[in-house]
Every structure is written in structure tokens, then in C-alpha cells.
From Swiss-Prot:
GO terms for biological process: lipid storage; post-embryonic development; reproductive structure development; sexual reproduction. Its main location: other. It is a multi-pass membrane protein. The gene is OLE1. Residues 29-148 are annotated as: Hydrophobic. This is Oleosin 1.
Length: 148
């Protein structure tokens, strides 16, 4: 029993613990090599097409660049302006909707946090007012009375 040797399985385990036959492994490898080779050839063709397109387009871009560059800059600025305007519009509608819900008492998300912050701020304002009154009363000379 002590000299019993365990052999390593020659086949990989499948996803459910079943051993896959050698032919299945060969088929998987052949499929992977075929797909990888096809993608490699395709990437080479795309690279060659890009180089050819740049070779043809570069003289045209150089000739028309005094017109194209300002036009592209203008189009880009107009597009960014419209997108920014739309974004600010959506933000404004969202904020106005939230304010409407808050004012009508529908408790939108974050309203309780706003109320807590408002109460804390009001409490601190009262504390500062009280301290200012105490400070003012302490530093008034005894001979002078405040006229109210």
C-alpha cells in the first residue's frame, strides 16, 4: 500500500468535473489558433489600409487645412456649447423639480439632511447671537448705560 503511485491525469477537468477527451482539446486548440490567426491577419489588413488611407489623405488635408481646421474648430465649439447648454438645462430642471417637491412637502431625497443642516445652522446662529450679547454687556463701562 505504501508504494502505491498515483498517476496524474492526462486530460483536463471540464467545468462539471468531467474529463475532456483528447480530440475535444485538439479541436479547442485548433479553433483558438484559427480565430487568433484570422484576427492577426485582419489587424494587418487594417494597418495596411490605414497607411494607404493616410498616404492618400495627407496631401488633401495639407491643401485644404486652411479651410478644414477652422471649420472643425468651429463645429467642435458649437457642439460643446450645445452639449454644455443641454447639461445645464437638465441640471436646472432637476434642481427645480427637487425644490418644488421640497416646498410642497413631498420629502425628496436629501430633504431630511437639509433640514438637519438648517437646524444646526440656526442653533449656531443663536449661540453666536447670545455670545455677542454677553460680550457686549460685559464690556460696557459701568458709568454708561445703553440707550434703547
Amino acid at each position: 500500500m505504501a508504494d502505491q503511485h498515483f498517476q496524474q491525469p492526462l486530460h483536463f477537468q471540464g467545468s462539471y468535473g468531467q474529463q475532456q477527451p483528447r480530440s475535444y482539446q485538439v479541436a479547442k486548440a485548433a479553433t483558438a489558433v484559427t480565430a487568433g490567426g484570422s484576427l492577426l491577419v485582419l489587424s494587418g489588413l487594417v494597418l495596411a489600409g490605414t497607411v494607404i488611407a493616410l498616404t492618400i489623405a495627407t496631401p488633401l488635408l495639407v491643401i485644404f487645412s486652411p479651410v478644414l481646421v477652422p471649420a472643425l474648430i468651429t463645429v467642435a465649439l458649437i457642439t460643446m456649447g450645445f452639449l454644455t447648454s443641454g447639461g445645464f438645462g437638465v441640471a436646472a430642471v432637476t434642481v427645480l423639480s427637487w425644490i418644488y417637491k421640497y416646498v410642497t412637502g413631498k420629502q425628496p431625497p436629501g430633504a431630511d439632511q437639509l433640514d438637519q443642516a438648517r437646524h444646526k445652522l440656526a442653533g449656531k446662529a443663536r449661540d453666536i447671537k447670545d455670545r455677542a450679547e454677553q460680550f457686549g454687556q460685559q464690556h460696557v463701562p459701568s458709568g454708561q448705560q445703553q440707550s434703547s
